[in-house]
């Protein structure tokens, strides 16, 4: 029986354990917003048609994309992959995301514009890859190499969103519908929400469900449940019923 030579090739390629997981010289201006906004996206990315164990969300994580240039990577501010195990090989937290090892490319990437990376994020740089041994730009990687279906940039200073959807002609403007950018594969949309997150009031990017309801964070769900319980307790008191007494009687019945 003949052996498939591709098996040896895959074994020879590095995995996430073999590749660097950080680069202190990576351009961009890390700031508090670059922590909070990706976190809110992560907490609200809850597709109904995928279980939590079939989703991986990365933030400021090395994304290795070329098996012929195994040291080349991009570092998206936020990206999501569906149809892949939450844990690497179903057992370990990821150090990086290595596309040739995982076998699945991201569904969507979000970049938060910074002065040092804005031109590259928006596809305004001239390098297209393999010029003088330089790696290709983010735009080239996302559009041509990985062919990521959805790409979105967000400027925290102007609150401007620039969104693109992959077509046969490459990335084309991705128009908002009902004040959001619909992602068919996960039956959710991205929208701009004005509110308070982590004590900060501003416009944030966050996910909405197919009924256009904002998907709540765990903290928001807990607060909503507390408010519901408080309203119920107040109503019971209006009817002359002590809600605390009900708890005591239930314990005595047990």
Please identify what each model-predicted range represents.
Residues 58-61, 91:
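Short Pro/Gly-enriched beta-strand edge/turn motifs at strand-loop
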Residues 2-30, 35, 47, 65-70, ...:
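C-terminal interaction segment
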């Amino acid at each position: 029986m003949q052996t498939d030579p591709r098996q040896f090739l895959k074994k020879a390629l590095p995995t996430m354990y073999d590749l660097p997981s950080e680069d202190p010289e990576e351009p961009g201006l890390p700031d508090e917003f670059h922590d909070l906004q990706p976190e809110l996206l992560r907490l609200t990315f809850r597709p109904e048609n995928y279980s939590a164990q079939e989703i991986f969300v990365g933030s400021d994580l090395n994304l290795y994309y070329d098996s012929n240039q195994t040291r080349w990577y991009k570092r998206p501010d936020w990206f999501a992959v569906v149809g892949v195990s939450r844990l690497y090989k179903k057992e370990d937290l990821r150090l990086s995301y290595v596309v040739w090892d995982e076998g699945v490319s991201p569904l969507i990437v979000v970049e938060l514009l910074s002065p040092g990376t804005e031109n590259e994020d928006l596809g305004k740089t001239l390098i297209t890859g393999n010029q003088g041994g330089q790696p290709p730009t983010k735009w080239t990687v996302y559009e041509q190499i990985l062919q990521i279906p959805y790409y979105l940039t967000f400027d925290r200073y102007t609150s401007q969103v620039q969104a693109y959807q992959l077509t046969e002609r490459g990335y084309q403007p991705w128009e908002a519908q009902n004040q959001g950018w619909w992602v068919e594969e996960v039956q959710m949309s991205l929208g701009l929400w004005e509110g308070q997150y982590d004590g900060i009031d501003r416009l944030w990017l966050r996910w909405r469900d197919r009924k256009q309801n904002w998907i709540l964070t765990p903290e928001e769900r807990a607060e909503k449940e507390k408010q519901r319980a408080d309203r119920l307790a107040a109503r019971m008191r209006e009817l002359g019923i002590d809600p605390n007494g009900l708890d005591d009687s239930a314990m005595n019945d047990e």
